[in-house]
């Protein structure tokens, strides 16, 4: 199976006052083109589909358009809630949408939502684990020994895949690889916690046995510990420290007994740029016209921009 792994769409997001919905639609149109070009058979959306729990109507319509286009192409969608999403709202009409091969997991109840698809090698099972906090797992699994985020996710996942079992995990958590935290950017809500050392995380070893673990939560694309545990990253730059970064979608070739991820570059409608210089130069007409999204850092300390 060819699985396209996306995460952290943050539909409805604004950066420095700029509405990014046209940019987000442009990227989603590219995703549809990638699906056609690479014979994509399923799409994973690993959380933070919206930027807020109450997204603007235009963002909801954009997601509706995207899911409808995938349904018309007979491409199943496997989507989970992230920490920016409203789990309850994302679950709305989940039963009806399943009939169109759109599988949503908003709220955690007692176990990941399990979806079984067929490919040329037989059954391929997807475990959909939405963003969950230890307190929620304690409430749903009162007999489990929950000490921290790592033990909470271990309990939430339940039994790991056995030998010969073909399973893929979709999750939205902070994950450690080899004892190291992933590289974060300023647009993530966890960035401040990482900077002060208070973040809780899950050990990537918890995902042993899965053919592939499709992660969301971190906006820089990267593997965690091994190539088959991966953050897709956000499809657009959402903070200045990401300016110039190459964004991508992950095409995962899932075989009989393993998976091989491949990065497919995404091209933004507008590049985010960080300019420095004298105030009069930065505010000159030719500079303003040439740049779409900029952060102006003036040499004059009294300037307010």
Mark where each language-model region is.
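Divalent metal-coordination and catalytic microenvironments
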Residues: 8, 48, 82, 126, ...
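Hydrophobic anchor at the start of a short beta-strand
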Residues: 77, 167, 261
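Binuclear metal-dependent phosphoesterase catalytic core
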Residues: 112-125, 129, 229-291
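Conserved small/polar residues in nucleotide/adenosyl-binding loops
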Residues: 294-304
């Amino acid at each position: 199976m060819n699985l396209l792994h996306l995460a952290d769409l943050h539909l409805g997001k604004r950066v420095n006052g700029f509405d990014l919905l046209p940019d987000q639609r442009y990227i989603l149109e590219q995703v549809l083109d990638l699906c056609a070009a690479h014979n994509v058979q399923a799409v994973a959306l690993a959380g933070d589909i919206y930027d807020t729990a109450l997204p603007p109507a235009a963002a909801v319509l954009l997601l509706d358009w995207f899911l409808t286009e995938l349904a018309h192409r007979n491409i199943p969608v496997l989507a989970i809630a992230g920490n920016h999403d409203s789990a309850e709202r994302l679950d709305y009409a989940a039963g009806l949408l399943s009939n169109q091969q759109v599988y949503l997991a908003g709220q955690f109840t007692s176990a990941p939502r399990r979806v079984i698809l067929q490919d040329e090698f037989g059954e391929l099972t997807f475990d959909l684990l939405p963003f969950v906090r230890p307190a929620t797992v304690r409430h749903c699994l009162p007999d489990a020994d929950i000490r921290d985020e790592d033990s909470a996710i271990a309990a939430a996942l339940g039994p790991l895949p056995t030998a010969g079992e073909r399973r893929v995990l979709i999750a939205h958590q902070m994950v450690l690889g080899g004892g190291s935290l992933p590289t974060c950017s300023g647009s993530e809500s966890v960035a401040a916690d990482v900077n002060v050392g208070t973040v809780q995380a899950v050990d990537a070893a918890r995902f042993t046995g899965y053919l592939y673990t499709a992660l969301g939560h971190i906006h820089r694309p990267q593997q965690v510990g091994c190539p088959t545990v991966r953050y897709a990253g956000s499809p657009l730059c959402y903070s200045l420290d990401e300016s110039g970064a190459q964004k991508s979608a992950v095409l995962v070739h899932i075989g009989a007994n393993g998976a091989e991820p491949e990065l497919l570059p995404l091209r933004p409608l507008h590049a985010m740029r960080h300019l420095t210089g004298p105030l009069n130069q930065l505010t000159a007409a030719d500079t303003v016209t040439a740049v779409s999204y900029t952060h102006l850092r003036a040499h004059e300390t009294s300037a307010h921009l």
